[in-house]
């Protein structure tokens, strides 16, 4: 049995069709069918139910599929890590969500550069969900994100829980709560601007889930492309916007930022790495996180 046989089988399962899998794998359909039959003969089990369209996996086939996916994932990770170790001049590719640039991430990266001048750093903007795929494919080595996305191949380290704020125009009627804060239930009738409109799940879907978990339904939601535009529209009186506290540093004029008092009104900032990756740059970047947080009197969640 070779890795290509596992890859063929996994593709057929995921495409639910021999013809679609053959097209995706860029091979003819008859040879692919023969390879699947040979795999069944070698294993001594039937992987697919006969006569079903779309292709239906047997119970034994599904068990084998789950393990085949793990084998292919681990093999890809091992290959990626081996290539990196063999590279004389080490390059560290760091994925990040753009909103973190308004917080402490730039200080963390700068400190890491100063302490590790031998490591070349490439910064790659990508959403939290995209970071998971990029990590598994070896396109990035670390990912700084905000969303809680689980994957068996990825280890997620929560660094900090950043408070959420409600951005309003300084003359908005909710300005009376600037010092005391508001609950989400108090703002469901306000025109609400959400960002971004990129691939979901994203920060907008995260905010919507906070309302859903409390049984609340905002009356008017408008999705905006990015945080700067959303805050600019708030300054123009178009509505209100929920943002991480670090967004205050963007510096849009005529805005107030009101604390949101609900228990889960925070945005987790996390570092994502491959489960099999035990490279020394991971503890080094975590040490930089702790050092930068300490200068800002923030207690990190890592030890």
Curated annotation (Swiss-Prot):
DNA-binding region listed in the record: 18-37
Record's note on what induces expression: Negatively autoregulated.
Q: Which family does it belong to?
A: Belongs to the LysR transcriptional regulatory family.
| Cellular component GO terms, alphabetical | protein-DNA complex
The family database entries (PANTHER family) matched by this protein are listed as:
LYSR FAMILY TRANSCRIPTIONAL REGULATOR (PTHR30346:SF17), TRANSCRIPTIONAL DUAL REGULATOR HCAR-RELATED (PTHR30346)
Domain HTH lysR-type span(s) in chain numbering: 1-58
Stored InterPro entries: HTH_CatM, LysR_subst-bd, Tscrpt_reg_HTH_LysR, WH-like_DNA-bd_sf, WH_DNA-bd_sf
* Superkingdom field: Bacteria
Q: Name one GO biological process term.
A: catabolic process
Q: Which CDD domains does its entry note?
A: PBP2_BenM_CatM_CatR (cd08445)
Do you know which Pfam families this protein is assigned to? HTH_1, LysR_substrate
- Organism per entry: Acinetobacter baylyi (strain ATCC 33305 / BD413 / ADP1)
**Keywords in UniProt for this one?**
Activator, Aromatic hydrocarbons catabolism, DNA-binding, Repressor, Transcription, Transcription regulation
- Asked if the keyword Repressor belongs to this entry, the reply reads yes
> Function of this protein?
Positively regulates the expression of catA, catBCIJFD and benPK in response to cis,cis-muconate. It binds to the catB-catM intercistronic region, to a specific sequence upstream of catA and to the benPK promoter region. Can also repress pca genes.
The gene coding this protein: catM
Q: What assembly does the database describe for this protein? A: Homotetramer in solution.
Question: What name is this protein filed under?
Answer: HTH-type transcriptional regulator CatM
